[in-house]
């Protein structure tokens, strides 16, 4: 994307994962070849050249005769407020980590990459964290992407991992969450909160497949829809 940041490509016959080699050590791309889909497609909100059109007032009609040019017509499908187009302070990627201290403050690990050797199936990153250290390992194993964390000598707090996922379906029956017991609590367009869970499936009928999120130990899961503003 010509942002000047080096990228590390991990790949096999099923999956390609692209990691930004910056302090976040997060994925900017996750390609599933069998589904022909990138789960890490660009979701970071940036300033776009067409946002100035949001200041225009949609007109119900025109006094002039003839058909208005499509380039001059401004109409909004949904109500858009300034906060909807505010640039993101941090990039929206997969496996973006944060550390919530007991005093309520938030710290973000500043990862540094270890040495890499071909063939690239795994990568290791480390970061100091409140007097201790966190190690992050990203590994490909067939159609599975494994991301492991090990915290050493870190004081009390809460470690959170954010996954910004791009899927064809956002709302409606075609995009829904499936729990371990095969029940469907809601669709991608609704908020979902799970306590002490180890598995959640994102089933997308438009995609023709799904994504299974699993954890080695019980975790709290918060899932929310993400809305963007685009010109079409």
Q: How does the language model describe each region?
A:
Residues 2-15:
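Acidic, glycine-anchored loop motifs typical of Ca2+
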Residues 7-9, 124-126, 150, 201:
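Residue-level detector of beta-strand face positions
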Residues 11-13, 33, 128-132, 205:
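Short strand-coil-strand connectors
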Residues 15-21, 134-138, 209-215:
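Broad, structure-driven detector of short, well-ordered beta-strand segments within folded domains
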Residues 18-90:
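Catalytic core of carbohydrate-active enzymes
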Residues 50, 221-232:
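Active-site pocket scaffolds in enzymes
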Residues 76-148, 231-232:
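Extended, loop-rich substrate-binding clefts of extracytoplasmic carbohydrate-active enzymes
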Residues 143-146, 150-220:
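Polysaccharide-binding surfaces and accessory modules of carbohydrate-active proteins
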């Amino acid at each position: 994307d010509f942002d000047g940041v080096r990228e590390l490509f991990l790949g096999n016959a099923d999956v390609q994962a692209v990691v930004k080699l910056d302090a976040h050590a997060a994925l900017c791309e996750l390609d599933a070849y069998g589904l022909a889909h990138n789960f890490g497609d660009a979701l970071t909100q940036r300033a776009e050249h067409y946002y100035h059109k949001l200041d225009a007032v949609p007109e119900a009609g025109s006094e002039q005769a003839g058909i208005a040019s499509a380039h001059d017509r401004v109409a909004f499908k949904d109500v858009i407020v300034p906060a909807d187009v505010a640039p993101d302070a941090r990039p929206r990627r997969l496996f973006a980590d944060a550390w919530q201290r007991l005093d309520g403050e938030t710290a973000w690990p500043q990862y540094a990459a270890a040495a890499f050797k071909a063939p690239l199936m795994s990568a290791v990153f480390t970061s100091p964290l409140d007097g201790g250290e966190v190690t992050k390992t990203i590994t490909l194993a067939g159609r599975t992407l494994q991301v492991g964390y090990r915290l050493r000598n870190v004081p009390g707090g809460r470690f959170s991992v954010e996954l910004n996922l791009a899927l064809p379906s956002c709302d409606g029956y075609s995009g829904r969450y499936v729990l371990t017991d095969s029940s469907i609590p809601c669709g991608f367009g609704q908020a979902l909160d799970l306590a002490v869970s180890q598995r959640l499936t994102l089933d997308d009928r438009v995609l023709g497949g799904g994504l299974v999120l699993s954890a080695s130990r019980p975790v709290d899961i918060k899932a929310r829809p993400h809305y963007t503003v685009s010109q079409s």
